[in-house]
Curated annotation (Swiss-Prot):
It comes from Nitratiruptor sp. (strain SB155-2). Belongs to the UPF0763 family. InterPro entries: UPF0763 (IPR019724). This is UPF0763 protein NIS_0363. It comes from the Bacteria. Pfam families: DUF2603.
Amino acid sequence: MNIEKSNGKSLMTKINNLAKELGIENPQGVTIVRLEDTEDPNKKTLELVQGSWESKAPWFVIDKEEKVHVLSTLESILHLIRSLNEAKYENFNLKLEKAILENLPIDFNDVWVVAMSEIQKRLTESKNKNLLDIDIKKLVKDIKKHHPNLFMQLKDLQFPPQGHQ
């Protein structure tokens, strides 16, 4: 079956690019099927365009509007969701770490413990339980305001006067 061009770009090129983005090593070997209507409005047929019915990799499905869909196993989708959640959590931690370090902590771990405690408190009190909705910079500024002893103050640092060695 010939896959027509969609908006000047062939669907095969689009599918190959999508496959590469999904980390599929051999995008030319992916399974591609076309979803076709039948006389029965409750039934559709799948026509194999490329690849194999036995392929375990995600399948690419082309609908009648030439839109490309990806069909995958539930395990793969759950793995993807877990990976995204881990990445979001890691990103949040990195942003928190950066915000703490920007405020010159005396002991990073002490500030981290206070920050985690404050985050737990805010999540418990909030209707929205989304960790990502917490303004990290404001959180650290609030900690610095309420616990100034955890942070260095630039005015407290002693520098030798200029011109002396």
